[in-house]
């Protein structure tokens, strides 16, 4: 019976991707080995990947989006779009929804997780990404703020309090 379950799962998984959710702590290597970025790229389909980059957490989304676009293009990406979402209503843009239909990888950059959350949370666009990730249709990665918004509970701020030391 387990073999049938395994075969059923294999049929559901997009053959272009290795289903993955990569939660990257931040400060990933963007210059030398780029190992974690290369892992995402490979799991999203490598040169056959169709990637979406969401730099909305950044104060400078154009610069951040362009940086990751160049990185993935240098790895061999041929089909790639930067989702320039700066207002919640931008999530309703049909071009993003249409592009996600054949997307094999979504990468969310670092920055301010509260900004990213306020732009994407509970939008049809984010729901489409979530459903695709759950169904194994895309590799989903986020670094720093992009990683923080993937969890059910997210730390959005705080203050440094007194440190308790057990003596």
Language-model features: locations:
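Class I SAM-dependent methyltransferase SAM-binding "motif I" and its flanking Rossmann-like core
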Residues: 18, 109, 115-167
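Extended, subdomain-level signal for the structured scaffold at the beginning of enzyme domains
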Residues: 2-115
């Amino acid at each position: 019976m387990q073999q049938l379950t395994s075969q059923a799962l294999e049929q559901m998984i997009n053959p272009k991707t290795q289903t993955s959710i990569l939660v990257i702590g931040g400060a990933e290597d963007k210059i030398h080995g780029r190992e974690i970025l290369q892992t995402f790229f490979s799991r999203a389909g490598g040169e056959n990947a169709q990637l979406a980059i969401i730099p909305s957490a950044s104060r400078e989304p154009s610069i951040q989006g362009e940086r990751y676009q160049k990185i993935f293009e240098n790895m061999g990406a041929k089909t790639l779009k930067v989702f320039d979402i700066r207002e919640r209503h931008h999530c309703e843009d049909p071009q993003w929804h249409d592009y996600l239909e054949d997307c094999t990888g979504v990468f969310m950059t670092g920055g301010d997780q509260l900004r990213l959350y306020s732009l994407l949370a509970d939008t049809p666009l984010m729901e489409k990404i979530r459903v695709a990730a759950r169904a194994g249709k895309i590799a989903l990665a986020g670094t720093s703020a992009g990683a923080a918004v993937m969890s059910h509970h997210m730390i959005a701020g705080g203050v440094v309090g007194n440190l308790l030391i057990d003596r």
